[in-house]
C-alpha cells in the first residue's frame, strides 16, 4: 500500500494525535487509489470525527482532492471568490450563500461557486439553482466561459470530483457527518483567491481558517453565526476569523453596528424545494422580507471584504442593499442562464 503504514496511521488517529502533511497525503492517495477497504475508510473517517481534525490535516486532504479533480483547462487567472457553508447547523434556512453569490457578482466580485445537492434531504445550492433553470451537467467549457463573460459560474461538485461520488454509499451507511463535509468547501477546482465560509460550530472556526491559510488563500472570512448558523446571522453577535496576507485575526460582528435590524433565525427559514426557490427568487428580485434581504446583504459585505472591493463592512452592507433593491441579483442570474441554462 504505497509507502505508508496503515496501522501506524490508524494508531495515531485513535490516540488523538495529529498526522503530518506527508502522512495525510499518503492516506488520502491510498484512498483515492482504492487501496483501502471500505472498513478502513470507515475507520479513518470515524477516527477523524472523534479526535477533531486540524487545519493542517484538512489542508493536506484538500490538496490531494483538488489535484485529483477533473479539470482539462487552465485554472482561470482571476481573483475569484467562493461563498458557502459547511452545513450541519440544523437551522433549515433558505439558500443564503447562493443568493449572496449572485448579489456579490452584481457588485463586481468574480464568483466561482462550488456546490452540491443537499445530502440531508434539505435543499442544497445545486437543488435550488437547478430549480430556477441552471443546468448542472453543462459542459465544463461552458462553466469556464460563463465565468469569463458574466463574472459568475457554478461548479457542480460531482462533475469535477468523481472520487467523492464513489464515497457517497459509505457516508450514507455511516449516517453521521464526517471530515468530507468539511472538505467540500475547500476543494473548489478553480482554486479561488478568497473565500467566505460559514461553519456550524465555533470549534471549527480556527481549523478551517488555518486550512484556508495553508491552502494559500489571500483573504478569507470564516464565520459562525449567532444562534448556531453557518452564515453570518441577524440574531446577535457573529464570531469571525479574518485571514489576510497570511495572518488570522479573531473578531465579532455586531449587526447593529452595521445599521441592520436584529431578527431571529426563524425568520430565515426555508422549506421544501419550491419554497426555497420562491424565497431565492424574491431576494434576487429585491422584494423579499426585511430579514431575508438584510441577512443576504450582511453576508455579501463579507464577500466584498474578502474580494478587496470594500474594506468597510457597513459600506459593504449599504452597497449590497442598494444592489438588491435594484434587482441586480436577478439580472446576474439571467446572465448566467445564457451560458448554463437548459438550452446549453
From Swiss-Prot:
Cofactor needs: Mg(2+)
Pfam families from the UniProt entry: Glycos_trans_3N, Glycos_transf_3
Residues binding anthranilate 2, per UniProt: 171
GO biological process, one term: L-tryptophan biosynthetic process
Chain residues that bind Mg(2+) 1: 97, 231
Binding site for Mg(2+) 2: 230-231
Reaction equations catalysed: N-(5-phospho-beta-D-ribosyl)anthranilate + diphosphate = 5-phospho-alpha-D-ribose 1-diphosphate + anthranilate
Example GO molecular function: magnesium ion binding
GO cellular component: cytosol
EC annotation from Swiss-Prot or TrEMBL: 2.4.2.18
Entry keyword set: Amino-acid biosynthesis, Aromatic amino acid biosynthesis, Glycosyltransferase, Magnesium, Metal-binding, Transferase, Tryptophan biosynthesis
Domain of life: Bacteria
Cofactor annotation remark: Binds 2 magnesium ions per monomer.
PANTHER family, alphabetized: ANTHRANILATE PHOSPHORIBOSYLTRANSFERASE
Function field: Catalyzes the transfer of the phosphoribosyl group of 5-phosphorylribose-1-pyrophosphate (PRPP) to anthranilate to yield N-(5'-phosphoribosyl)-anthranilate (PRA).
Sequence similarity: Belongs to the anthranilate phosphoribosyltransferase family.
Complex formation: Homodimer.
Protein name, UniProt field: Anthranilate phosphoribosyltransferase
Amino acid at each position: 500500500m504505497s509507502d505508508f503504514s496503515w496501522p501506524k496511521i490508524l494508531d495515531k488517529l485513535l490516540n488523538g494525535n495529529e498526522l503530518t502533511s506527508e502522512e495525510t497525503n499518503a492516506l488520502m492517495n491510498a484512498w483515492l487509489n482504492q487501496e483501502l477497504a471500505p472498513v478502513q475508510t470507515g475507520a479513518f473517517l470515524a477516527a477523524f470525527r472523534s479526535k477533531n481534525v486540524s487545519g493542517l490535516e484538512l489542508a493536506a486532504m484538500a490538496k490531494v482532492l483538488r489535484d485529483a479533480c477533473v479539470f482539462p483547462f487552465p485554472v482561470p487567472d482571476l481573483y475569484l471568490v467562493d461563498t458557502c457553508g459547511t452545513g450541519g447547523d440544523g437551522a433549515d434556512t433558505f439558500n443564503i450563500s447562493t443568493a449572496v453569490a449572485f448579489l456579490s457578482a452584481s457588485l463586481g466580485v468574480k464568483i466561482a461557486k462550488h456546490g452540491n445537492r443537499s445530502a440531508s434531504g434539505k435543499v442544497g445550492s445545486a437543488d435550488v439553482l437547478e430549480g430556477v433553470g441552471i443546468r448542472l451537467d453543462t459542459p465544463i467549457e461552458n462553466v469556464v466561459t460563463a465565468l469569463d463573460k458574466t463574472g459568475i459560474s457554478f461548479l457542480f461538485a460531482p462533475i469535477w470530483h468523481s472520487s467523492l461520488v464513489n464515497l457517497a454509499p459509505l457516508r450514507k451507511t455511516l449516517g453521521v457527518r464526517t471530515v468530507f463535509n468539511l472538505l467540500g468547501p475547500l476543494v473548489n477546482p478553480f482554486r479561488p483567491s478568497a473565500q467566505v465560509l460559514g461553519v456550524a460550530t465555533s470549534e471549527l472556526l480556527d481549523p478551517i481558517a488555518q486550512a484556508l491559510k495553508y491552502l494559500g488563500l489571500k483573504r478569507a472570512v470564516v464565520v459562525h453565526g449567532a444562534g448556531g448558523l453557518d452564515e453570518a446571522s441577524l440574531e446577535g453577535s457573529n464570531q469571525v476569523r479574518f485571514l489576510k496576507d497570511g495572518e488570522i485575526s479573531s473578531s465579532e460582528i455586531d449587526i447593529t453596528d452595521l445599521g441592520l435590524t436584529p431578527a431571529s433565525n426563524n425568520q430565515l427559514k426555508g422549506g421544501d424545494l419550491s419554497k426555497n426557490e420562491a424565497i431565492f427568487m424574491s431576494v434576487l428580485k429585491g422584494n423579499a422580507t426585511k430579514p431575508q434581504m438584510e441577512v443576504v446583504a450582511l453576508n455579501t459585505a463579507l464577500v466584498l471584504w474578502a474580494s478587496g472591493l470594500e474594506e468597510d463592512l457597513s459600506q459593504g452592507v449599504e452597497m449590497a442593499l442598494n444592489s438588491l433593491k435594484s434587482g441586480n441579483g436577478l439580472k446576474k442570474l439571467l446572465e448566467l442562464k445564457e451560458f448554463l441554462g437548459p438550452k446549453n
